Design a protein with these regions (language model features):
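Short, positively charged, Gly/Tyr-enriched micro-motifs
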Residues: 47-124, 186, 223, 240, ...
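Short, conserved catalytic/metal-binding motifs centered on acidic residues
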Residues: 59, 73-74, 103, 107, ...
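An anionic, glycine-rich sequence signature occurring as long contiguous blocks
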Residues: 243-354, 361
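Short, solvent-exposed helix-loop connector elements
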Residues: 41-48, 338-347, 360-380, 397-401
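Active-site-proximal, Lys/Arg-enriched surface segment
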Residues: 108-185
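A short, flexible helix-boundary coil/loop motif
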Residues: 7-17, 39, 264-304, 363, ...
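Basic, short loop/linker segments at the boundary and entry of helix-turn-helix/winged-helix-like folds
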Residues: 12-62
Length: 435
């Protein structure tokens, strides 16, 4: 890959430039830099050091934009800037040539100074800034839906501590890093809002409650909280209801749930049932959650069809149960019960947006192999900022178009290309590069 290839195919003729102001294109990067540099004050640089903190961060962030390693990015940027500069390149007495960009080893050494707790605080501060910017610009509303899910990153090293957990779902290893992700969905815009690495034996419920409290402190209101069945806790549903939100979560096939499904198939019960479940009897603090259970047919089947075939004896009870699923919500039925049940169960499908979002994060760059948890956190933060930038710019481009008019299909690759152009343009001005 030559140094000229860091410039993507020009997209400036597409009419996009006037709609995306430079003020907010790279505002997330500026916030990231200031948040990180402000926490590096105790690490004194050598008097003869020719690089500033921002130089190391530019290499790191541009590596995420390029989707390349720190080494490749450092060499590409260095070759590109030197090709644009006039004059001879200085050669030191030991044969080394003067660089314009810090080397990979220096960048990695700088990033490793950032511990796990600092990285968590930086992630929290940067994502908060981006969410509030989206709110101020009208891209999302103050009433948001929260999506919660886990993601796993395989680990191939020799560490054996609480932050490295066991798994049987990864190829070539039985170890992983376990991350709990949070995202917001509002006005059809999906933005990442938080991330937390979960240790072995650590309860996820306090982490979720703390995050939701933080959202309320930022000025947001909860509408729905969409979760998978692994978050099936009465305590959590009770807390969400107390915060003014409603939870939607798949129901586990306990005896009571199976009985409700059987009674519905036999015509003794409706598709919506009131259900009360609680935490274990031996728990220190017992919580009780009152929910509404919704029975819904799986894709390719109709609820009436499954019920009719069961009553006519065409399928067994076991087959009928495999064709339906149950979800529960703390929200009370509104309007016509059957319509409300269909709307609620269909809306739950949007929980998959956080899982497809994790796939998009992996498209931005390959996963780092760094053994430092703080560096891995910064890598995930950079990807989330770039993902949110894509979603926010896509929403900005859709806003000027009237209803009925086709809006530009702004893809992740287009957004990455546009950010590279803007990033390099600012970088050239900073280094005094002659066009």
């Amino acid at each position: 890959m030559t140094c000229n290839n860091i410039f993507p195919i020009s997209i400036l003729r597409s009419g996009i430039k006037p709609l995306l102001s430079n003020d907010h294109i790279l505002s997330f990067y500026k916030k990231f830099s200031s948040a990180l540099i402000s926490r590096m004050w105790k690490f004194k640089r050598a008097k003869n050091s020719r690089y500033e903190d921002s130089d190391f961060l530019r290499v790191f962030f541009f590596s995420e934009l390029l989707g390349r390693s720190i080494h490749d990015t450092s060499e590409l940027l260095n070759a590109y800037l030197l090709s644009k500069k006039r004059g001879r390149r200085k050669i030191f007495s030991d044969g080394r040539r003067k660089r314009e960009i810090p080397h990979q080893t220096e960048v990695n050494k700088y990033l490793r100074k950032i511990g796990l707790q600092k990285a968590r605080n930086i992630l929290r501060e940067c994502l908060d800034k981006q969410l509030l910017e989206a709110l101020d610009n009208g891209l999302i509303s103050s009433k948001v839906n929260v999506l919660i899910d886990f993601t796993e990153h395989p680990y191939y090293g020799r560490r054996d501590d609480r932050l490295i957990k066991g798994t049987n779902r990864q190829k070539g290893t039985k170890k992983m890093r376990h991350y709990l992700g949070f995202s917001l969905l509002s006005r059809d815009t999906h933005l990442y809002a938080g991330l937390r690495q979960v240790a072995t034996g650590q309860s996820k419920i306090p982490i979720i409650i703390k995050f939701l409290d933080h959202l309320l402190d930022l000025g947001f209101e909860l509408k729905y909280v969409l979760m998978d069945r692994e978050f099936y806790r009465a305590e959590l549903l009770d807390e969400i209801k107390g915060m003014g939100g409603d939870a939607i979560i798949p129901a586990k096939n306990y005896k009571t749930i199976k009985r409700f499904v059987k009674e519905y198939l036999e015509g003794k019960r409706g598709r919506v049932s009131s259900y009360t479940f609680s935490s274990a009897v031996e728990a220190r603090c017992r919580f009780i959650a009152h929910v509404n259970l919704i029975i819904k047919a799986k894709r390719g089947f109709s609820l009436r069809g499954v019920k009719r075939k069961y009553q006519q004896g065409e399928i067994t009870l076991k087959e009928a149960r495999h064709r339906v699923f149950t979800i529960m919500t703390t929200q009370k039925p509104r309007g016509k019960e059957s319509s409300w049940a269909s709307r609620t169960s269909l809306f739950y499908r949007r929980r998959w947006m956080i899982e497809t979002g994790f796939s998009d994060l992996n498209r931005i760059n390959r996963r780092w192999k760094s053994n430092h948890d703080g560096v891995r956190y910064l890598d995930m933060l950079a990807r989330m900022l770039l993902y949110n930038s894509w979603k926010m710019n896509k929403k900005r481009l859709q806003t000027p178009h009237k209803k009925g008019m086709s809006s530009p299909n702004w893809t992740l690759n287009q957004n990455q290309d546009f950010l590279r152009v803007t990033f390099l343009s600012d970088y050239e001005k900073l280094h005094g590069v002659v066009g």
